[in-house]
């Protein structure tokens, strides 16, 4: 019932909404790898998802522990074990930098990678100005990517593809909130009370 805590929890729920939507889309791509476009999607978004989700995992679990207070810190809770084990996800089968280099390599070596992304994101163009601006910016950077831009390009690609899934399949309020959270260069803004209510109800199965 506390407004500040509702913001914290709603932002966590929003992250889960975006990540879950993208992972379901990625699973579909893995099931259809005989299709060239789906193969390219899986090659690009698998390392991008691993990079982004694993990097956000540690602060996410830490936030969850803080929300619960002492209960979250005690070993009777599952959270301490998750917090200790979370760093291995960014190391196992390749560090964050390796994942980003994999994305850059796929952009360079896979014919039609940019065309596939244009086709994938075309249905949601025009629905959100932040998405449209970020997508134009990403395409400009991706045409001549440099290694030092690897993390930026990978994170932006992940956020854009999450946004595309939410713009297609989630409520307009949730999709718009995601775009403001991840694609607005001016920084994060407060979630409205209506969006907080929507996200928290979904998170608890209401």
Where are these regions (language model features)?
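Flavin-dependent oxidoreductase catalytic core characteristic
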Residues: 1-206
